[in-house]
Structure formats: structure tokens, C-alpha cells
């Protein structure tokens, strides 16, 4: 991937517009998890240290496009950014007509999704954004898979377009994990539905040595292996597809192992007692809510032997401690492994936080959908735009 990097450009005295991914959880007007904001700090500080006037933009939530709604305002993000940077970050509501921040200052534009045409990558809006800056920096890996005005269109018309520190680091890490991995390559894909990750599973089954599936996804594979899943979440219409994926992985010399034991409950509830069962002993009224201890041990062995680990999604309902042991044990196995490890996806990040292993994962991706699309082998529109502006 050839693209301009922010670090290659003289930013002194320049108006620098940075697209970040500040789509963070907010409650009662306060940011409840600032991981994505912290991840952007090196890029912002680099621009400030280089003598730029810094303008930041992001989306937050899913407001009705073209309409201001206070619940989706970027104000809580501006407040948290001010605290983290140790300097004022001014929230600017009306900026399309022009914004002229002073060198050394930071402004945060109001939610880009309040602008009509943002999601459709409207050319007029993209040109308005481009006119605000001398240098456009795309730093939001989490939205790199969307061709929108603030992530794609603006970069086509800005005088200079480049990748920020975070985006460049993301792309370098993902390239290392998937394009030239140290073997064995082990991928962990969790989540509730095969349907939402079918392309990822298909793509990974072609390249990995072991593809560990967890969550509701695993239930469909358990069913495909001929076992009962009781009243667990699974997709009947994708059982044949799961079987095909297992056979395809085997044909390539890899495997998609099926759990040998699981942790079940009768209801999906925080107070529900957990019971370990062999995968052959699932009752009609059981719900599979985690992988069992023997399965965890086997999967941890795969991870221990790995040269590269890609982790996307928990393997159980880790929000409930009694159904979180599988995710905890695999997380610790990754943390203790000598492999190059990359993890991504919202639930994965929450699990990493819960078990306190962030500093022992080689690289934590800030992307959810973008991380998945990269795993699928798709070209991300924002990256394609940066490559086209590399000259």
C-alpha cells in the first residue's frame, strides 16, 4: 500500500483537517470509554508540534442526517479531548462556510452526520470540507470502509491528502498480520451470527492454520458437526455453509475446530447458574453461552504455538462472569503468547479492557467494520483514495 503519511509533510502554518473516529459511548453528557480518543492523540499532537492549526471532525452515533440533535453532539468529546490534551478544544457548530483556527489551537467540528450528504459522499459537501484545509489527514481506520464525504470525498479535493499516524500504524499492522504472517496463523472470530461474518470466515478459512469460532457463530458450527444445540442462538439456514467452510479449511491444510465442551444456562440472564457440559450432552432447553474448560485449554494450545494471532470477537457472553471464562482464558493465552497479535472490534476491546491485557496485545485495532472488511480482503475506499493521491 503506497500512500502519503502525515509524517512526510511539512505542516508548519498549515490548516490541517483531521478525520478521526470519535464514535465513543456517551452517558449523561460524559464519554464513558475514551479509548478511541486516546488512540488519536499522537496524530493530533504531531500536528500541533509541527506548528499547524488543527481542525478535527468525526461522526457520533446515527443521527437523522441534516438535523442537529443534542444527544449526538460532539460536546462530550470536545470536553474529554480538552482534558487529555491539556488545552482548550473548541466545538464549532457552523463550519462549512469557513473555519479559521489559529496556529497551535484545536477545534472540533460538530458531528459530520449533521451535514446533509455526508453518508452519500456528496461532492458539494466534500468540496466544502476540502476548502477548509491545506492538508487533509485521514486517521479514522474505523470508518475507512465507508465512502463518505468526510472520509473519502474530501480527500479527493483537498490540496494534499495523507494518512495520520493511527491509520498508517493500523494498515502496517494488518498488513503484517495478513499479508506476510509468521506461521502458524490463528484467527479467532466471535459474534452472534455467521451471516454477519460469513465473508470474513470464508476469506480467513483460506489463509489461516486454525480458525477458532466463538459466540453464536460457534453454535452454527456445532450444529453443522452433528450435535444438538438446544435453544441456543444459531442459524439453521447456514448450517450447510458452516459445513462447507470446515471442509474448505481442511482442504487447505487448516481447520475450524468445534468445541468439545461448552458452558450452558437455561436463560440469558446475569444471575443464571452456569453448567459445563460435553458438546454431546446438550439438552433441548440448554443455551450455549461459552466454550468449556477443555475447549479453552485446546484453543489456548493453538494460540501458544502461533506465530500470528488475529482476534475479532469474544467466544462467550463475557459480560456475565460465569459465561466469560472462555474469553478470559483465550485473552490471557494471547497476552502470554510470543506471537504477533492484532485484535479489533468493539466487543473484543471491551474484553481486553475487562481482563487488563491491553499492554500485552501487539496491536489493538480501533476499527470494527473496517477491521472485518480488511480481513475479508476488501479494498477500503478511504485507503484507495489515499493511494490515488500518493503522487
Curated annotation (Swiss-Prot):
InterPro entries: Phosphoglycerate_kinase, Phosphoglycerate_kinase_CS, Phosphoglycerate_kinase_N, Phosphoglycerate_kinase_sf. Keywords: ATP-binding, Cytoplasm, Glycolysis, Kinase, Nucleotide-binding, Transferase. ATP binds at residues 197, 319, 345-348. Substrate binds at residues 21-23, 36, 59-62, 113, 146. One of its GO terms (molecular function) is ATP binding. It comes from the Bacteria. It is an enzyme of class 2 (transferase). It is found in: Cytoplasm. Pathway: Carbohydrate degradation; glycolysis; pyruvate from D-glyceraldehyde 3-phosphate: step 2/5. HAMAP family: Phosphoglyc_kinase. Its EC number is 2.7.2.3. GO terms for biological process: gluconeogenesis; glycolytic process. Belongs to the phosphoglycerate kinase family. Monomer. PROSITE patterns: PGLYCERATE_KINASE. Pfam families: PGK. GO terms for cellular component: cytosol. This is Phosphoglycerate kinase. It catalyses: (2R)-3-phosphoglycerate + ATP = (2R)-3-phospho-glyceroyl phosphate + ADP.
